[in-house]
C-alpha cells in the first residue's frame, strides 16, 4: 500500500455545504397568505440498500407565517443529502420536518420526483398544516 503525503483540500462548495444552516428572515407581508414555490432539480442521495445514486427534483411549496426561508440556505441544505444513504420516503419526510422546524409555516408541501431506476418511477409527497 502506498501512502500519500498530499494534503486533501476541502473545496469551498463542500465547506459551504458542511457548514450550511437553514436561515430565515422576517416575512415582509405577515398576515397575507401567499404561496412560495421552489424547484430544486439537482437533488441526489444514495440508496441505503444498494449504494447506487438516486436523483430527483424536489418541489417545495409553502405559505409563510412570520419567517421566510433564504434560498441559498435551502440549496445548501438539499445538497447536503448528496452522500447520505437514505430512502426516498425518509428523505422527503426529513426535508419537510427540517424546513417546518426552521420557518414554522402556515402550510408546506414537499414533493420528491425521483428519476426512474430499474423501470420504477417514484414520487413521494408529504404535507404539513399548522393547527
From Swiss-Prot:
Pathway recorded for this protein: tRNA modification; tRNA-queuosine biosynthesis
Catalysed reaction, written as an equation: 7-aminomethyl-7-carbaguanine + 2 NADP(+) = 7-cyano-7-deazaguanine + 2 NADPH + 3 H(+)
Subcellular compartments: Cytoplasm
Domain of life: Bacteria
Entry's Gene Ontology molecular function annotations: preQ1 synthase activity
Active site: 47, 54
EC number from the UniProt entry: 1.7.1.13
Family label: Belongs to the GTP cyclohydrolase I family. QueF type 1 subfamily.
PANTHER family per the UniProt record, alphabetical: NADPH-DEPENDENT 7-CYANO-7-DEAZAGUANINE REDUCTASE
Protein name: NADPH-dependent 7-cyano-7-deazaguanine reductase
Organism: Microcystis aeruginosa (strain NIES-843 / IAM M-2473)
Amino acid at each position: 500500500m502506498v501512502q500519500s503525503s498530499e494534503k486533501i483540500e476541502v473545496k469551498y462548495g463542500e465547506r459551504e455545504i458542511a457548514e450550511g444552516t437553514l436561515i430565515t428572515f422576517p416575512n415582509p407581508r405577515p398576515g397575507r397568505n401567499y404561496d412560495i414555490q421552489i424547484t430544486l432539480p439537482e437533488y441526489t442521495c444514495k440508496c441505503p440498500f444498494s449504494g447506487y445514486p438516486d436523483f430527483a427534483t424536489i418541489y417545495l411549496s409553502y405559505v409563510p407565517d412570520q419567517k421566510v426561508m433564504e434560498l441559498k440556505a435551502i440549496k445548501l441544505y438539499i445538497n447536503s443529502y448528496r452522500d447520505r444513504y437514505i430512502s426516498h420516503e425518509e428523505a422527503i419526510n426529513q426535508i419537510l420536518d427540517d424546513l417546518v422546524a426552521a420557518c414554522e409555516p402556515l402550510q408546506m408541501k414537499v414533493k420528491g420526483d425521483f428519476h426512474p431506476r430499474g423501470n420504477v418511477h417514484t414520487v413521494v409527497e408529504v404535507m404539513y398544516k399548522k393547527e
